[in-house]
Amino acid sequence: MLRTALLGLLFITTAKAQFQFFEQMFGGGQQHQESSSQGGNVPSDSAWYQNTYNGAQCSNYLCPGTLACVAVPHHCPCAHPQVEDKFEFGEGSAICASKGGFKAGETARKIELARKGLL
């Protein structure tokens, strides 16, 4: 009888500890939302971005990644120019690729090799 009671107590304490762990890991529901609006992490919905995008004044093209107003889409700047190189394709489009520690111009060379199927 004592053994059964001790096993039951052990089971309950272990289960409670697990639930507390998961509650702490995943923010505990409402408590997480409150802390994010008080200067914590940014909420995971896209309302801020959509409101900013819809409220931006641009008579030409509004870049979706940076919200910069440019004449044509391939003139959009990279969101993180310190770590990204911009590569413009001949057909009026562009991409930003991670510099990845390569020497200057290496990213563009690798992109060209990939476009030709050589990489």
UniProtKB/Swiss-Prot annotation:
Keywords: Signal. InterPro entries: LCL2. Transmembrane segments: none annotated. One of its GO terms (biological process) is ERAD pathway. The keyword Signal applies. Coiled coil: none annotated. The keyword Signal applies. Residues 1-17 form the signal peptide. Belongs to the LCL2 family. Probable component of the endoplasmic reticulum-associated degradation (ERAD) pathway. This is Long chronological lifespan protein 2. It comes from Arthroderma otae (strain ATCC MYA-4605 / CBS 113480) (Microsporum canis).
